[in-house]
């Protein structure tokens, strides 16, 4: 567990891109990230987040580096803070199969930005150049380098996990509540046994193979 001083230093380090944008005259800087590009099932979800300048949010980090308990706490903290603006975009399995996962991810990000109650004037995007009328900076591994993108990653991850738990209630045999659609050994075994359901991405290789083998719900 990091001390308060260490957490403050980490927050400052992760605010460099935001500080640079402020110096350039921007004031509403949104971090944008996705969750669910790699899974075999479920939608891809994007989060967008505008943090208020001058306010510390200790503990915010790449969602993958946080424990489920830490991530949930920060998710609720961000949503409940009236000074924080959060948005979410969701693109369905059908759309992923139609346009491919990269384009679907971009579409989810555009949706997330559009859903913000305050329109940003600058975007910090994790790993992708996003064609958008709002000025945009692509940051490789942005969820580890920008506090706004890290916040967006938490929003996207928690929101998607909730969706996958709902899908689990419809199709408990796949274990979506545990692996969230990723290609774990248990998921691949279930796919082999039961075939794909309506929430599987038919354009992804292991799902394609099960369809070719004639295994289906």
UniProtKB/Swiss-Prot annotation:
Write the Enzyme Commission number(s) for this entry. Answer: 3.1.26.4
Domain named RNase H type-2 is located at: 27-216
Keywords, in A-Z order: Cytoplasm, Endonuclease, Hydrolase, Manganese, Metal-binding, Nuclease
Look at the named UniProt entry and state the broad enzyme category this protein falls under.
hydrolase
In terms of domain of life, where is this protein from?
A: Bacteria
Task: Describe its function.
Answer: Endonuclease that specifically degrades the RNA of RNA-DNA hybrids.
The protein depicted here goes by the name Ribonuclease HII
Gene symbol here is rnhB
């Amino acid at each position: 567990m990091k001390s308060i001083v260490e957490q403050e230093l980490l927050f400052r380090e992760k605010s460099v891109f935001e500080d640079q944008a402020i110096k350039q005259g921007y004031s509403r800087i949104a971090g944008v990230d996705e969750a669910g590009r790699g899974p075999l099932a479920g939608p891809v979800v994007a989060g967008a987040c505008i943090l208020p300048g001058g306010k510390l949010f200790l503990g915010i980090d790449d969602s993958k580096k946080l424990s489920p308990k830490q991530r949930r706490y920060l998710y609720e903290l961000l949503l409940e803070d009236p000074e924080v603006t959060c948005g979410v975009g969701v693109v369905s399995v059908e759309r992923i199969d139609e346009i491919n996962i990269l384009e679907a991810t971009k579409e989810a990000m555009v949706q997330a930005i559009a859903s913000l109650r305050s329109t940003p004037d600058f975007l910090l995007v994790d790993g992708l150049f996003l064609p958008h009328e709002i000025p945009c900076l692509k940051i490789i591994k942005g969820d580890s380098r920008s506090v706004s993108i890290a916040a967006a990653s938490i929003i996207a991850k928690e929101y998607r996990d909730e969706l996958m738990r709902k899908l689990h209630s419809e199709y408990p045999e796949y274990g979506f509540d545990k692996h969230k659609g990723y290609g774990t050994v248990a998921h691949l075994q279930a796919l082999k046994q039961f075939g794909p359901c309506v929430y599987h991405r038919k354009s992804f290789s292991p799902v394609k193979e099960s369809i070719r083998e004639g295994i289906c719900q």
